[in-house]
Structures are given as C-alpha cells and as structure tokens.
Amino acid sequence: MARSDWKRPTTFPLSPGHRRIRLLLSYDGSGFSGWQRQKTERSVQEEIEKALFKMIGEHVRVQGSGRTDARVHALGQVAHFDIVNQRVPAEAFAIALNQRLPHEVRIIESSQVTDQFHARFTSICREYRYFVKEYAHYTPFDRGRVCRVKRFPPIDLLNAYAAYIVGTHDFTTFAAAADQSESKVRDIYTSHFSFEESQWGGRLLMYTVQGNAFLMHQVRSMVGTMLQLGEDLEPPEEFGRRLEARDRFRAGKTAPPDGLFLYRIDYDDPQ
C-alpha cells in the first residue's frame, strides 16, 4: 500500500509563538491503564502532562506516536508537545521531566523539532516485540514482562505462520471488537520468531513485527493465535485461512499484555 493511501494528515502547523519538543521515552506499563489519558485510571500521557505543568506552568497536550494498552511496555515510544515557553533549552526537558516523573517512566532524550514533525502521523514504521517463556524457567524477575507457556511450539512452524502476516492485508480477524479504525488494512514489513537467552535464566521466545501501523490488540491477537495453532501443530495454511477470513471470531485467545513492548518508532526525518 502506497504511503499516500495511509490517509494521514500532512500538515501540523504550530500556533504563533509556540515551539515543538520531541521526546524519546521508555516506561514500565505494569501500573498504567495504557498510554492514553483516562478519566479515572492512571496513564503515561497524564503523568508526563502533570510533570510538564509542574515544570513550566503550562497545560500541555502530549501527543504520542500511538497508544499502548494497559500493562504494555515501551522501550522506544516517541511523543511531542507544543509550548509557549522559550526559556528552557530543548535538551533540558529530559533531565527536568525525569526529576518529576514516577520511576516507571523515563525520558531518554528531548529535542526541538519543526512543524514538519508529528509523533504519530510522520512515523513510517513501528516495531513491537513480544516475549514468551516456558513455565519451567519462569522467575520472579520475569513477572509482568513475559507470557508464560507450558512449552514452546516448534519455531519453524511459528515462523511459517508469521510469514503470512508480511505484506498488505486486511487484519479484521485480529482487531479488537472496540477498534474504530476506518480501515483494517495495514502494511507489515517484518514478522518472525527467534530465540534469545534470558538474563534470568532459560530461553525467551521473541516475536518481532514491524509495520506502518497496528490495530487495537492486533499484535497480541496474532501472537495468541499463532501460539495456539502451534500448540496443536496445525498446518501453516490454517493461519492463512484465518487471516483471509476477516472474521475476529476466527482468532485464537488474545495473548496477555505483559509480554508486549513497543520497541521502536522510525521516521523519515525526525526534524
């Protein structure tokens, strides 16, 4: 699908007298209802906006590259905000915000960008990683950061499922019922499983997926379906049939949020 078909805004003007600050940040999502501000629940967005008000006295709306669900983590989330304040150097926001944020949220870097940059709409690729571990090797330090299974399905079979995901597809099967996207079509560039050693002992099964955008619960639904099919040793074609069905009732059980990380956001030019 051509980038012109993504149906995204193309202009992001700054109000007079404002400047735009870009943040690269990470967070442990265990204690949050997700990225987006909620009426009654704790969110990452709200914590950053509160810290900004304490710092510069402005009520600022922070725009993230995308939403993460409750208990989903981020290693490379990107956000931006527009402010009137001209005194604080852009690079100083990272240090100053970290002094005011809860320990679960850290700003890695901050920089000033032009009105050509938008954290959500100028991104070209998002990467998620999902981690799975066998019960036998699960430790207290894995809590909240991996999905547990009795045993790993054959990785060759999992990768045969994952190969069906690459390309431009309608992912209705793997979208949450609450997803309100106008189109369920997404471009997926990379989709594969691999093993890596856990620092706490044992092996981690890691699923990596890269795409232009993702539907609500899409990654977790795809992972849950592939793990379920792999456990039953279903042929690769079965996953393909479920994808093509465009029927969310054909998806398997959605994998838990604990093992999911927003790993990286790529841009043509972050400035």
Can you say where each PLM-predicted feature lies in the sequence?
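Structured-RNA-binding interfaces characteristic of tRNA pseudouridine synthases
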Residues: 2-271
